[in-house]
Amino acid sequence: MKLKTGVMAAALMAVACGVQAQVVVKHLQPNEKSPIANGVWAGDTLYLSGQLASPVTPADEAKGTAAVYGDTKTQALSALNKIQALLKEQGLDMKDVVKMTVFLAGDPEKGGKLDFPGLQAAYTQFFGTKDQPNKPARSAFQVAALAAPWALIEIEVIAVRGK
């Protein structure tokens, strides 16, 4: 009886302490020269790095001016399209986004104030629509500046692969 009780107690302790599952971590590299991963998988959760806009006309990229990238709405649409493409490469879609963080720089054309309506106009084309009704938890902040001097917006997301 004592042996049975001891074995049972040991088994219960093992279950109570839990067996830690191995979480597979995979880094998505944009290219060999970039010091930043496009994203990181941790189990079924994908953490995408912040995305900036692409130039409206790629041939103008070397100019590096805000006009080449557009206003907040244009930049937000560009960043969201990049996010959508990155998610698609990983077998996900915008419906899988559970958290979004948006960093907005003040728009010089708006007296240094952030263009929240511009963000919303782009955001509502991807979330809360008839075709894609899901909406992630979201935070949006005005920051003093972003890494690229022309950037008005940077968006990062967390997405989860459903079972």
Label for each model-derived stretch:
Residues 3-81, 85-98, 104-163:
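N-terminal presequence-like segments and the immediate start of the first folded domain
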